[in-house]
Regions:
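N-terminal secretory targeting modules
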Residues: 1-79, 255-257
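Alpha-helical scaffolding within the catalytic cores
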Residues: 64-68, 127-138, 168-174
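Conserved SGNH/GDSL esterase-like catalytic core that processes O-acyl groups on lipids
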Residues: 74-159
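Sec-exported extracytoplasmic/periplasmic mature domains
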Residues: 105-109, 139, 143, 151, ...
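Conserved beta-strand segments of alpha/beta enzyme cores
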Residues: 114-116, 183, 213-215
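Charged helix-capping and loop-helix junction motifs
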Residues: 132, 161-171, 199-203
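Active-site segments of SGNH/GDSL-like serine hydrolases
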Residues: 149-153, 174-203
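Catalytic His-Asp segment of secreted/periplasmic serine-dependent ester chemistry enzymes
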Residues: 193-257
Length: 257
């Protein structure tokens, strides 16, 4: 009898050990699977984070009009041409186009924004632009964006305001035809201080610009009053201080700075 009981106890113990072993093994497998699954999730999240960080590091850090333009084109590069009179040049320092582009170089993480400045000097008037092949010259550069100064000061005393607008419009049409898709930003020539006829020509430009296929950026409000203009304009053209002021005003629109 004792042997029978002892044998039964041994069998129960063995069965219990077997059940415990299988329970333990099943539990270990479950934990292992959960660990592998979590590791997979963590790795996936790390990959997502890594991809996002890489995207952010390559992201476009330019605001304003240019940032919107790059976003709309899904582009990370652009070529810009600044075209105008001697008001876009500065013999004594950096011109306002150079100062604007310098801000882009300092503030952009990855976009390749290249540019050039094409000046027609102080004598060429708007009615000569097509005849002298300037539309062709711009087209050769194949810009994505053309920043066009109105040449109003060059036209002052040579052409009526309405004629200036007509020639400017024809020039814009010619450029747009040769460079399909180019974005054109039109800016008025700088103020010059006390004058009679010239401000009226700018007024006509302001009135007619909305009818042109351009984005018009009037920066005149950023300039000081006529009696304070001497430090910013000399012989009708911007001084270094004037170029800095113009660059600051245009940059607020162009790159949001």
């Amino acid at each position: 009898m004792k042997n029978t009981v002892f044998t039964a106890l041994i069998m129960v113990s063995v069965v219990g050990m077997v059940i415990a072993h299988f329970y333990y093994q099943n539990r270990v497998n479950t934990i292992a699977k959960e660990a592998i699954s979590q590791a997979s999730v963590d790795t996936h999240n790390q990959e997502k984070t890594s991809t996002k960080a890489e995207h952010d590091s390559e992201g476009i850090e330019i605001g304003g009009w240019l940032g919107d333009f790059l976003d709309s084109q899904d582009a990370d590069s652009a070529y810009i041409v600044f075209f105008g009179s001697s008001s876009i040049e500065n013999e004594n320092g950096k011109s306002w186009p150079e100062l604007v582009m310098e801000q882009i170089d300092n503030g952009a993480a990855s976009p390749a924004i290249d540019y050039e400045v094409i000046s027609v000097g102080s004598d060429t008037t708007s009615d000569q632009l097509l005849a002298e092949g300037f539309a062709d010259k711009i087209a050769e550069s194949e810009p994505d964006v053309l920043v066009l100064e109105s040449l109003t000061l060059n036209d002052n005393g040579n052409l009526a305001a309405s004629d200036s607008i007509a020639h400017l419009s024809a020039f814009i049409d010619a450029v747009s035809e040769q460079i399909p898709g180019v974005e054109i930003i039109l800016v008025p020539t700088n103020p010059i201080g006390p004058a009679t006829v010239y401000p009226g020509q700018i007024d006509v430009l302001n009135e007619q610009a909305p009818s042109l296929p351009v984005t018009y950026v009037d920066h005149w409000d950023a300039w000081p009053a006529e009696e304070e203009m001497a430090a910013y304009v000399e012989s009708g053209r911007p001084t270094s201080e004037g170029h800095e002021l113009w660059a600051s005003a245009f940059s607020q629109f162009f790159i949001g700075e």
